[in-house]
Amino acid sequence: MGRSIRLFATFFLIAMLFLSTEMGPMTSAEARTCESQSHRFHGTCVRESNCASVCQTEGFIGGNCRAFRRRCFCTRNC
């Protein structure tokens, strides 16, 4: 009886280790993203690629068209 419990516990532990690696690799925590309205982008923001290009000239990593008024918001890691 004791041997079967030990065998079951060993099998269960190996199965849990195998299943935990199937869930994907551990990833590091992502940095928070801060946003600021672009100072150089003028007019209605229609194309996000245009907004991102302007934001990169301002030193940000990218940009998105946001809000009801379609303004260009630049993004960077905090």
Curated annotation (Swiss-Prot):
This is Defensin-like protein. Transmembrane segments: none annotated. Predominantly expressed in the pistil during all stages of flower development. It is found in: Secreted. One of its GO terms (biological process) is defense response to fungus. Its main location: secreted. It holds the Pfam family Gamma-thionin. One of its GO terms (cellular component) is extracellular region. May be involved in the defense of the pistil against pathogen infection. The keyword DNA-binding does not apply. SMART domains: Knot1. Residues 1-31 form the signal peptide. Gene3D superfamilies: Knottin, scorpion toxin-like. Keywords: Antimicrobial, Disulfide bond, Fungicide, Plant defense, Secreted, Signal. Disulfide bonds join 34-78, 45-65, 51-72, 55-74. InterPro entries: Defensin_plant (IPR008176), Scorpion_toxin-like (IPR003614), Scorpion_toxin-like_sf (IPR036574). Belongs to the DEFL family.
